[in-house]
């Protein structure tokens, strides 16, 4: 019988490897069937002002990005670990409206019992709009609505 006061401790390298695999395999949509290997059922995703919860939330978040970018690819460029958290700098690549797009992003993943329980992510949305040639329209819209 397992001691209830004993917990499995993973080192920073294994947490970083899990975070990298989750981003490159699951978040790209290539291995959605393996999401339970990386994400807790209690998972909460805070991404670009949106919030997704649970394993279904992972699926919905990935579906959002795969609709925006066909042939989605996620490549982790750099990682930092601290205790139960891993920060990953990544690039999303794919096609949108027939144009190749590369979007920089950062995710901070918090682990519990070897699984990701929470992510905080931001991506360079303005950079994506510039690459698609629609950023001026976005700025006009923001001015119209008094955001600028």
Q: Which residues does each predicted region cover?
A:
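C-terminal and inter-domain tail/linker signature
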Residues: 1-148
């Amino acid at each position: 019988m397992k001691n209830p006061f004993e917990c499995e401790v993973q080192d920073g390298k294994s947490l970083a490897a899990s975070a990298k695999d989750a981003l490159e395999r699951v978040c790209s949509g290539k291995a959605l069937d393996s999401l339970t290997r990386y994400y807790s059922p209690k998972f909460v995703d805070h991404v670009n002002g949106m919030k997704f919860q649970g394993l279904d939330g992972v699926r919905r978040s990935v579906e959002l990005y795969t609709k925006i970018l066909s042939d989605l690819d996620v490549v982790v460029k750099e990682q930092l670990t601290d205790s139960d958290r891993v920060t990953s700098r990544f690039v999303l690549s794919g096609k949108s409206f027939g144009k190749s797009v590369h979007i920089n992003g950062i995710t901070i993943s918090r682990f519990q019992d070897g699984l990701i329980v929470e992510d905080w992510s931001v991506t360079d949305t303005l950079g994506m709009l510039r690459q698609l040639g629609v950023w001026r329209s976005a700025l006009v819209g923001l001015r119209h609505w008094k955001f600028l």
